[in-house]
Amino acid sequence: MAEQKAKVVHGPGPRGMGGPRPKVENPGKLLKRIMAEVFQHYLPHCILVLICIVVSALANVQASLFLQTLIDDYIIPMTQQQDPSFAPLAGALVRVGCIYVVGILAAWLNARIMVNVTQGTLRNLRIQLFTHMESLPIRYFDTHPHGDIMSVYTNDVDTLRQMLSQSIPQLVSSAITIVSVFASMCMLSWQLTIVTMLMVALMLFCSKKITQQSGKFFIAQQRDLGKVNGYIEEMMEGQKVVKVFTHEQKALEGFRELNDKLKDSAKQANSFANIMMPVNAQLGNISYAICALVGAAMAVTGMGGVTLGTVMAFLSLNKSFNMPISQVSMQANSIIMALAGAERIFKMMDEPSETDEGYVTLINAKYDKDDNLVEANERTGIWAWKHPHHDGTTTYHKLEGDITFTDVDFGYVPNKTVLHDINLYGRPGQKIAFVGSTGAGKTTITNLINRFYDIQDGKIRYDGINIHKIRKADLRRSLGIVLQDTHLFTGTVMENIRYGRLEATDEECIAAARLANADGFIKRLPEGYNTMLTGDGANLSQGQRQLLAIARAAVADPPVLILDEATSSIDTRTEALVQRGMDGLMYGRTSFVIAHRLSTVRNADCIVVLEQGRIIERGNHEELIAQKGKYYQLYTGAFELS
């Protein structure tokens, strides 16, 4: 927009993208909220997963304990027999094999279910994010970098995928394994259990120190990743400007700076995270070796009733005990990283939605036999405001397109007014043109009409109704808007025109294109109205894109038009085509027009000259020329329009 916008309060770093705070606040609350999302839709699945985890963990423990029986009751007696029978040993091995098969099947089922739970939860989160994003006010998008918003959908949601599919199930499995293995070790030998627990305490101490250091760097990594995404998005959108000013090297330097910061934060985070597994593995090996030495000594001396089978079973349990301890430490980093992403996700989801206290709605209407307006179920071409009253009655007022500003003051940020005491009116069928230098307040006025922003003081009335009483969706449905920056969606030409009114027929879309003088160039496209547009209509010229935007507004058939510099980027010949189409479109409609070219507003019923948020002149072209004021100076070239 050409007008003064809300000041973006930036955080550190290029392009002003701040990130999460140095530490995740309320990690317990965040984790609880994530799990609530999971349980809301997948509680039975989670119960089944828990059962599978318990079965798998107990199967592993039982297999380790069976080693004692296998060695003491089968293998050692066989070594003392001259002609041992292998049948009992084979039967024992089959039983061990069955235990392992049960554990493997439980683990496989657990993995399959968690894939379904994880992807379903992420799908629901993305839907909630997008649904909420659509309800956010324009102010949010004006004050938040789009690349940072995209990073929430991609990177932050993906960190939750790893946590839900791997980290949390492994933590639960580790907890169950630790409890069951600890009980089994105590049952086998409390002395060896004490030795193991001393080493576990050392492992936990090291893990805590490493996690504390890596946590802050994982959050910084997410922040820096958002900055990189934002910068790439900005450079892609502004690539033509970059090339025109030959700033490719400067753009590359900016990217390198952000990329280096991402590399540093990722390196620091992963340096700590990557040493955790080797450290814990080596401490586990030391624990295993000490238990083997102590256990062997106890078995030889017969201390505590420890046998060779007991030692072997205990060593197997020792491995099973150390592994989940290491996994807990390793998955803690993954959860911290996911919580950093979850904080950004829920921060966006907790942004207040656009408020709407309106209760006056826009309806299709018709006249009854007494010539009174009544609501119609079919499209009649007559629109009316349905105004319910406190006494239970309802009145219908035909939509005329009468818009009035009375003593309006407005500022994008508190204590900084950009519009001062604006008084103007647009009668049905009038063409009101706004002219003035960049930042004068032209686009801001049109933003107030469609309530992208709300005024601080004064009143805006639409057909005599305070626009705060009109439901925003109905208010905007009554307005046809051609924005300063034309945006086309991926799809056919016909689909882009129909976006103005989704129920419009092909014939109505073609008629709108003809009205906007777009039909000629559309027919020359390879597939005509079925030509696919991609990349915001990159295969069209700027003028053709503007013509499609005007056709899109025309098919909506609105009583009020807002044309925000609609022809500022079109060549003179195309402008003449557009102007003829626009004259037909604006006939009988209230129109608010902003243009850089004064030739496009000469036939306006009223020209409003703005300067620093104030109306300094108003009148038609002849009247303003006769005054020889600011408009005269702009028209004669004494001052530039922008």
Segments predicted by a language model, with ranges:
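Transmembrane helices of ABC transporter permease
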Residues: 41, 45-58, 99, 166-220, ...
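Juxtamembrane helix-loop junctions of ABC transporter transmembrane domains
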Residues: 20-28, 52, 59-75, 99-146, ...
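Hydrophobic alpha-helical transmembrane segments of ABC transporter permease domains
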Residues: 32, 51, 106, 110, ...
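Membrane-integrated ABC transporters
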Residues: 1-60, 75-96, 110-114, 118, ...
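Helix-loop-helix
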Residues: 77, 184-198, 268, 272-343, ...
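Short intracellular "coupling" helices and adjacent cytoplasmic loop segments at the cytosolic face
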Residues: 13-22, 119, 127-151, 155-157, ...
